[in-house]
Regions:
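Fungal secretory targeting signals
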Residues: 1-22
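A short, ordered amphipathic alpha-helix with a cationic face
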Residues: 19, 35-36
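Extracellular low-complexity, O-glycosylation-prone Ser/Thr/Pro/Gly-rich "stalks"
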Residues: 25, 36-97
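Beta-strand-rich binding-surface signature
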Residues: 28
Length: 97
């Protein structure tokens, strides 16, 4: 019976590590739309925009550039609004305006 309990615990630990991996990569810059695709960044994006005295409309949420400060929650800070659109820099690279 003990062996059957170990397997579910190991599976839960593996899933927890996968969930924790859905954060931005420290030091990279991200478009809002890419942060939303990575994980549950809606509240953090709104908070970063409000802290920077920026509007929280869809355009600013999706087309602003944010810096990944890192930490357990993948903390972010607002860099700028990309009026001409935010561009995906590709995997492992910073996004840009």
């Amino acid at each position: 019976m003990v062996k059957f309990t170990v397997l579910p615990l190991a599976a839960m630990a593996a899933l927890a590590s996968l969930a924790a991996a859905n954060n931005c990569k420290t030091g990279l810059n991200y478009c809002g739309y890419n942060l939303l695709g990575i994980g549950n960044y809606g509240a953090q994006i709104n908070g970063a925009l409000e802290t920077a005295s920026q509007p929280t409309d869809d355009g600013h949420i999706h087309e602003s550039l944010f810096h990944c400060n890192g930490g357990n929650n993948g903390d972010i800070s607002f860099i700028s609004y990309c009026g001409a659109g935010c561009k995906d820099g590709g995997s492992g690279n910073s996004d840009f305006c």
